Amino acid sequence: MSCFLQVMNPITGQNSWQERGDDYDYHLEVANAGFGDMLHDWERNQKYFGALRKTIAGMREAGREVHVLDIGTGTGILSMMALAAGADSVTACEAFLPMANCAEKILAANGAGDKVRLIRKRSTEIQVGEDMPRKANLLVAELLDTELIGEGAIGIYNHAHAELLTEDALCIPARARCYAQVAQSPLAAQWNSLKTIANLDGEPLLHPPEQLKSCQGEAALHDVQLSQLPISAFRPLTDPVEIFQFDFQRKQEREKQRAQLLKLQSKQPGAAELVFYWWDIQLDDGGEILLSCAPYWAHPQLKELAAEKAKDHPLPNVVPWRDHWMQAIYYIPKPLQLLEAGKSFHLSCHHDEYSLWFDAREEAPTKSVRRHTCTCDLHMTYSRGRIGQLNQSPRNKRYLRYLEESIEAEKSNVLVLGNGCLLGLASSALGAASVLLHEPHRFSRRLLESIVKHNQLKNVQFLDKVEELEDSQLAALTHIFAEPYFLNAILPWDNFYFGSLLTKIKDRLPEGVKISPCSARIYALPVEFLDLHKIRAPVGSCEGFDLRLFDEMVERSAEQAVSLVEAQPLWEYPCRALSEPQEVLSVDFSNFGQEHSLKGSIELKHTGICNGVALWVYWQLVEDNSPRSIVSSGPSEPVVPGEFVKWDMFVRQGVHFPRKPKDAVTHLEWSTDFKPLLGELNFSFGQKKL
């Protein structure tokens, strides 16, 4: 049976009814649950198994029976490990019903169907005597996220110890330790604050208003693959320090709120702008089996891991890769200037039941530091990537070069399309006679209005809809400008909404009006990822257990609910180019309604497994042959087959993951079908050996 859902099309900006199976949400949740990523984490799997073997053997030697509770069992992998390690009984719970049903089949396929009691409930809903026959004396669980406590681990462990576990119960993992490292990074700071926009001579055009300067930002974590942040892009001001420890094994309740004040000394001068954060877990009671989520430069096993890898393997990628537990950046509300090495300061660390936040001050705070929130609209409206993009100097210079060469003082009348288009607003500061700013988003508009007021721009008018433009306003236009950027965009070409807006006013525009960007081109590049492909790759077997039923479930759901191309910040996920990029679509915004159906083939020029295809957009600001007239949302340096691609760090690219990558492939065949007025842009890819 099917149903109809109203879906926003980012290219047309229109809501449309789409037919979906009544189990679409189920398939979407299964495909995006992220279980596969965890199952590809070999270190996690081996160390959980090792901790189970060691702990159960120790309990056996002490003459104890072993009754295991597995909270959030997923595929049932930890329950099967516990059985293999010698547990007397295993009870597993899983509240996500599709996963629980799959776990039941996997347990049966591995001969454990009648040995594991599977409960389809949250652990906090389980009753001893009703759901499980006795309290467990060994808890194994994976309830952690990048922040450690963001999935509710504190409350779940507290309930388990109070209701489901014996007084002498052991836990895997036994405890966790959280670490912080204070740093300065002009690059990372761009993700958090707005810089002055200057012209090509360095003279200020737009200053951030006071409300932006005084805003403390959002306390929420910025999760990143911190090992991929170039070592030259930050200045560590302290060594990593332990800030909190969580004892999952103790019977005493874990506090839901704590504060830790650390007096630190700077290793070198700099501004305490941000905190790098990660954690490690001791899986066994003795603390011998350690799993660390540290970035490579702070990883306790860096030397051993580097020795095991090939010489051409990048050092940042020798540590075990995982996407479910990353590292995080927290931004200091007001950066603290540390003018000399050895300067003392205080790092204030806080957590509640689900999150953390930090502050840095010269003097110790006299009262608890409250969790800060955005008061300026910037952080609550835009993603970290978009904030960084607004500050991206090389990118901004290309737009400003076009505007400075194109805008005539007191003569140009400019229509700006897009959300938060500060560059378009800069045309007012460059002397345009008038600027019409299309900004229908309430908070984005409020932010831009504050910038207009602060910079005393007198010739700016805001619009909710382009259809509301009067004929006289359109007739006077000399320029239409966009980056383009729209809040609803996920994939780079979702910003083709610029073309849809132009179509609405196309017949009313004067001849000779200059449109920038004038065109856009989508490029495709076959690549070999070191690790990112694992998020969509089948697992097969894991630590000797057959998980093919899980693979089949995910594949069925992915076929129905996952786009053939998804958005990823590729700077965080190294890949080698297997060829040069090839254009797969060109769009002329003066004739946006034209449909396209194209095919082609890319010859692979470097040996490797094509486990991904990267796609991005080149925006052509003006029709000339200058590379300075192109703004790329893809590689930031020329692509060389066989070498790692350097990607733009402030925008996500499109990625296609082949379902079954093939060996000895010589060509990637592609096709593109674009129906702009319907907002349909579809790609297909195939691998061939010719």
Curated annotation (Swiss-Prot):
Q: Which InterPro entries does the record associate with it?
A: Arg_MeTrfase (IPR025799), MeTrfase_PRMT7 (IPR014644), PRMT_dom (IPR055135), SAM-dependent_MTases_sf (IPR029063)
Give the EC number.
2.1.1.-
Question: Single GO molecular-function term?
Answer: protein-arginine omega-N symmetric methyltransferase activity
User: Which keywords appear in this protein's UniProt record, sorted alphabetically?
Assistant: Methyltransferase, Repeat, S-adenosyl-L-methionine, Transferase
- Provide the SAM-dependent MTase PRMT-type domain boundaries: 14-357, 366-690
Q: Name one GO biological process term.
A: peptidyl-arginine methylation
Q: What is a single Pfam family found in this protein's UniProt entry?
A: PrmA
The domain of life for this entry's organism is Eukaryota
Signal peptide per UniProt: none
- Class of this enzyme: transferase
Q: What does this protein do?
A: Essential arginine methyltransferase that can both catalyze the formation of omega-N monomethylarginine (MMA) and symmetrical dimethylarginine (sDMA). Specifically mediates the symmetrical dimethylation of arginine residues in the small nuclear ribonucleoproteins SmD1 and SmD3.
UniProt xrefs under PANTHER family: PROTEIN ARGININE N-METHYLTRANSFERASE, PROTEIN ARGININE N-METHYLTRANSFERASE 7
Its family remark reads: Belongs to the class I-like SAM-binding methyltransferase superfamily. Protein arginine N-methyltransferase family. PRMT7 subfamily.
Annotated protein name in UniProt? Protein arginine N-methyltransferase 7
